[in-house]
């Protein structure tokens, strides 16, 4: 059976890299001042982050059912017998549930994975799916293997301002104003299905240090069950030197890991704003 691996651009994988990896990518749309743009197609990350800094009206969206079905049908009518679709977490978007409903008409030829991943952790799921495909696993077997490790991943997110969380309804206007006055930086966490508040610290440097300390604690826990784990860093920094500095901080904390950096995807950046910084770690059970 020839299995196609499909994901969306929330994984940080875009069309050009997808061709190299052998992955088919559905670009995620974003609504900018009433007009639809597609991540990695007609709107760059630099342009998008600039729009956020200018506080232009931006909303995250999801691919239309027609766009998803068009991709699936083209693959299944060509060289592939079945496919695995790895969208962003169902807890962060309705795109996963939509895909699950659409897949019901394909008699198990389409397997939709819901393992609660986004950004660097979602990328790792795609790479794991490719590895399992090479081992000869079916689409259903790949889906089951990925979902078994759904909760062996965690993401911490630090943000520079509460303004974007206020616009998304995740913090009250009064809370955002007080937080700005006191230079409070929220530390958020994605563990499983939802983006939730974790703690608050004063100042950017303190937030970054606390974030890395929390990740070090998680890393030590993961090491008890696995010798091989994965470190990835993402951010919505507008300047290259800013994301380079953040990656170097993470590399210093985890000198035994080859830390990789990806731009933070549009779907998360819409809610946390520019100059946010994340540290992500996925437990690599599938590597064994």
Residue ranges of predicted features:
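Mixed-charge interfacial surface used for oligomerization/domain docking
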Residues: 4, 10-24, 29, 82, ...
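N-terminal glycine-rich anion-binding loop in soluble enzyme alpha/beta folds
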Residues: 4-62, 67
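A short, ordered amphipathic alpha-helix with a cationic face
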Residues: 37, 115-118
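A short glycine/small-residue-enriched secondary-structure motif
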Residues: 43-48, 78, 100-105
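Glycine-rich phosphate- or other oxyanion-binding loops that anchor nucleotides, phosphorylated ligands
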Residues: 55-90, 94-98, 143, 150
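Short, flexible active-site-adjacent loop segments at beta-strand->alpha-helix junctions, enriched
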Residues: 89, 116, 286
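A short, hydrophobic C-terminal helix/tail in secreted or cell-surface proteins
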Residues: 282-288
């Amino acid at each position: 059976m020839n299995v196609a691996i499909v994901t969306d651009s929330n994984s940080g994988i875009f069309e050009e890299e997808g061709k190299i990896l052998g992955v088919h990518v559905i670009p995620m749309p974003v609504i900018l001042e009433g007009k639809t743009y597609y991540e990695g197609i007609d709107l760059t990350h630099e342009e998008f982050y600039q729009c956020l800094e200018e506080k232009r009206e931006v909303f995250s969206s999801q691919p239309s059912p027609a766009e998803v079905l068009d991709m699936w049908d083209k693959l299944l009518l060509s060289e592939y017998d079945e496919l695995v679709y790895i969208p962003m977490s169902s807890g962060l978007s309705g795109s996963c549930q939509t895909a699950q409903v659409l897949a019901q008409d394909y008699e198990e030829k389409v397997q939709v994975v819901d393992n609660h991943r986004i950004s660097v952790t979602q990328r790792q799921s795609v790479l794991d799916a490719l590895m399992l495909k090479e081992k000869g696993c079916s689409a259903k077997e790949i889906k089951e293997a990925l979902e078994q490790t759904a909760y062996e991943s965690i993401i911490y997110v630090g943000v520079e301002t509460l303004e974007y969380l206020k616009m998304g309804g995740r913090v009250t206007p009064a809370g955002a104003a007080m937080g700005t006055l006191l230079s409070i930086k929220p530390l958020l966490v994605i563990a499983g299905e939802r983006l939730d508040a974790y703690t608050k610290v004063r100042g950017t440097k303190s937030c970054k240090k606390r974030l890395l300390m929390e990740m070090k604690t998680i890393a030590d826990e993961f090491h008890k069950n696995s010798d091989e784990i994965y470190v990835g860093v993402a951010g919505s920094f507008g300047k290259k030197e800013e994301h380079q500095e953040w990656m170097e901080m993470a590399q210093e904390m985890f000198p035994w890991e080859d830390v990789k950096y990806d731009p933070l995807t549009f779907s998360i950046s819409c809610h946390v704003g520019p100059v946010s910084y994340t540290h992500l770690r996925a437990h690599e059970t599938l590597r064994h």
